Amino acid sequence: MIDNIDDPNDSSDSSRAARARMRRREAQRAKLRRRRMWSVPAAAAALVLIVVLASADGGPSKAPGSKHGATGSAASSPTAIVSGGPVAPVAVGGRAALWASHNVVGVQPGTAAAYQAASKLAGMPGYLLIADRGNNRILVVNARREIVFKFPNAADLAAGRRLFYNDDTFVEPGGQALIANEEDNNDIVQVNLADRSLHVVFGHPGVAGSNGSLVHTPDDAYMLPGGTFTVADAYGCRVIFVRAHRIVRQYGTSNVCRHEPPRYLDAVNGDTPTPDGGVLISEINGSWVDEISSSGKLRFAFKAPVSYPSDPQPLPGGRILLADYANPGHVLIVNRHGRALWRYGPSQGPGRLDHPSLAMALPNGDVVVNDDYRHRVVEIDPRTNTIVWQYGHTDRPGTRPGYLNIPDGMDFVPAGPNGGPDYAAVVHP
């Protein structure tokens, strides 16, 4: 059974251990924040000017029909371009640009139709996969907040299939499996959806390191088309690409932690794939966001206007969606100069965020956010800056249906023709 930690004052060994893990994790991150504050700012000020893309403040750099326009055979723009608000304004192709062929990693049958249908729905426009980290489980819920998938279930636990501090979890290309980084267990695992088998695909469970077979606090494992996956080795200060248990590419130098990409990276907590084979990286110290091309060259680097950048996500028009892992936390859309184009972040009240770790764009133009330490996932309408959908009870961790405990990862799954989750249609970013 999964330990019930509904009561924050629970004195059981499992609850004490969970709280101790949270304290250790926050202490480690606080140490990194202090290190950032003590660093000499002059070098950072010079580095921020290294590279800047020629695009203007989030607007499109090329006309529709060019490489970066909102066209594509499988995901062509509808006759009337519908604005996705700040997430996908008409100027960059509207909502259709969110799933246009040049804005997704890989081409999968059914994606355009599934996402176009979802773009017309208010609220949660499909299914949401949630990495319920504090409860060591993965959930998939529908718009009515009903659980349609859970791993592990009782049979999985009886068979010895269990998760340990599973962090970010994403659907793999093709929809046959899920990939998850077990951050505090120092490994990456794969869950097969058909037979519910569980496999360690990199790292040694419970052993931290940063060499050819070990990772130290892995974050954001993404499976790429072709069988290679990328993961941020957070405190190894590198981003690695792994295939068949072997590192086949690496950005950053193992255990050399400083900002000089791509040769050196500081503590890394984001490594989002870009459509053309590059990677969008967030470094904790200095609040850096970097993009490295598929050939390994630095495209740009800027200081994000946040205290702790987390998991940057590419948007149409050269813009970036970013979470600020702080309390109160924020969600921003920035351009490649680091200028904020949109920001959400109430300082108090029910809309306040407490250490949001990931923000993702939905096909309907809303933004869904992991609100880690308020134990919920919220959907925000960026046109009104209001929460329009929520899973989890605010400030109340738990294991019962409707409850979460430090949700730290998620993925959007559109509905298929039969109304169920269409894992095969999922694309990233």
Predicted region positions:
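Terminal targeting segments of Actinobacterial cell-envelope proteins
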Residues: 1-34
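Hydrophobic/aromatic hotspots within intrinsically disordered, low-complexity regions
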Residues: 2-5, 22, 63, 81-82, ...
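Intrinsically disordered, low-complexity serine/threonine-rich segments
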Residues: 14-18, 42, 64, 69, ...
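Short, hydrophobic alpha-helical membrane anchors of single-pass surface/secreted proteins
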Residues: 35-42
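Hydrophobic multi-pass inner-membrane translocation pores used for secretion
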Residues: 46-48
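C-terminal region of N-terminal signal peptides and the immediate post-cleavage residues
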Residues: 50-76
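Histidine-/acidic-rich catalytic cores in large beta-rich domains
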Residues: 69, 78-429
